[in-house]
Amino acid sequence: MNKKSNKSIYLVQSVQRAVLLLEALANKEAELRIAELSRKTNLNQSTVYRLLGTLRNLNCVEQNPDTHKYRLTLKLFELGSSVINKFNIVQRAIPHMEALSRKYNEAVNLAKLDKDEIVYIHKIESYTTLKLDLKLGSRHPAYCTGLGKVLLAYLEEDELDSYLKRIKLKRFTPNTIVDKEELKKELIMIKQKGYSFDSEEYVQGVCCLAASVRDYNNKVCASLSIAIPSIRLKDNNIPLMIRNIIATTNKISCQRKR
């Protein structure tokens, strides 16, 4: 029996549908009615009602007594936090991220690559006017972000080729690279230089400098970036900033096992 058939045999429909509801509730709307959830998940309202009843009993969702809409509970936050806490790299990174953020008074972010996207696992907010809607656990494209490009650059060649075949390069700004050959050339350059630069490729007006973080086996396991408003980029000594970012990721990276 092949892996594909095994995967379909063990897919439990009720669990799959419950996760669809949780994902719908996790989107930007804080609360949703049963009819809204039905529309977003393509599940009929009676199914949504039954699943919500189970999720309420498990303390994963609750109903607002005033609006009668449903929302997620802190139970999901507890579960998510426990996953992040298992990443030893986050605990190692926090003091160094805080120091880098204080040095430049800019936002500093830490991310991992997961299923063709980057996932934010920690961030230090900027006290300046730059406020990006980057929630912990949120997913973003890898190919047009500084964090993502540095992670893609260190993939094995067959993994990168497979990624480029799967992914569709969507244009977010005039600077987004949407040619796969051009992107591959840039990723080769990133690996050679040891850092990546996102020049308003994902969000207009925002640039990012990023470098890789390594685990105990000296494999790239995460990436760290400074997000800077483009208007302030010229005020910084970019080569020095790059050196400081790389120095920070070297401090965070675990020492190779002997």
Annotate each language-model stretch with its function:
Residues 1-86, 90-91, 98, 254-255:
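N-terminal helix-turn-helix
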Residues 11-15, 34, 69, 73, ...:
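Short, structured helix-loop boundary elements
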Residues 59, 120-122, 222:
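A structural microfeature
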Residues 61-63, 110-111, 213:
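A structural signal for short hydrophobic beta-strand segments in well-ordered beta-sheet cores
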Residues 81-129, 154-157, 183:
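All-alpha effector-binding/dimerization core of bacterial HTH-type transcriptional repressors
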Residues 162, 168, 249-258:
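Cysteine/selenocysteine-centered motifs that mediate thiol-based redox chemistry or coordinate metal-sulfur cofactors
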Residues 176-249:
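Extended hydrophobic
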